[in-house]
Amino acid sequence: MPRKIVEPAVPLAKPVSEIPGGSIAALKRKARGCRACPLWKPATQTVFGTGPANAEIMLIGEQPGLREDIEGEPFVGPAGQMLDRALAEAGLDRGMLFLTNTVKHFKYEQRGTAKLHKRANAAEQAACRMWLAAELARVRPKIVVALGAMAAQTLFGNTFRLTRERGEWRVLGEHAVGMATWHPSAILRGRERKDAMYRQLVADLRSVAQRSQ
C-alpha cells in the first residue's frame, strides 16, 4: 500500500511524506542514523540545526562545508564568519537565531588530499527535506530566511529566481513570512560583485531585524 503523502504544517514548497517528531535534541539524534541518501557514507557526521527551539527567526543555508563537517555545527567556516559579520552589522544576535541547512551532510569531491565542495543533487535534497520540515515544525519561526538558491527553491518552489526576487517578503503558511538573500559562500566567490552582494545581504538582514521588532 503506498505511503500517504501528508501536507506538512510547515512552509515548504513540496509535501513531505513523513515528518519526524520530538525535541531538537531528539531530532538530531534521529538524523544521525538517517540513511535516506548516500551522503552519510563519506561524511564525518550529520550537521543538524542549532539555536533556541523557540527562535523567532530561522536562517536556512544550503549544505555543510568542510569545517561544518568536522565540527558538527552549521555556519562555522569562512561563510559562517562572513554571516556573523553581516548579522552584527544588521543588529541581529546569532545566539537568538536557529541556523540550519537544507542538506545535513557535507558533499564533496576528493582531489588529492583536498575535499572540494559539490552541490547536492535533487534526490539528495529531497531525502533531507523531512529533517528541515521537522526543524520548522518544532521551532515554528515567524520569520524564515533562505540563504542561497537551494534553500530559496526549497521554500518557494523551483521557479524562484534569487537574482530577481532576492529581498522580497513572502507569506509562508498561516504563521510565518520569508525572504531569500545571498548565501555568504556565493559572496565569497563573487569577485567583482563581492562588495555589492555583501551590502545587499546586510540590507536584507536589516529588513529581517526590523520585521522582528
Can you describe what each PLM-predicted range is?
Residues 2-213:
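A polyanion-binding, active-site-adjacent surface
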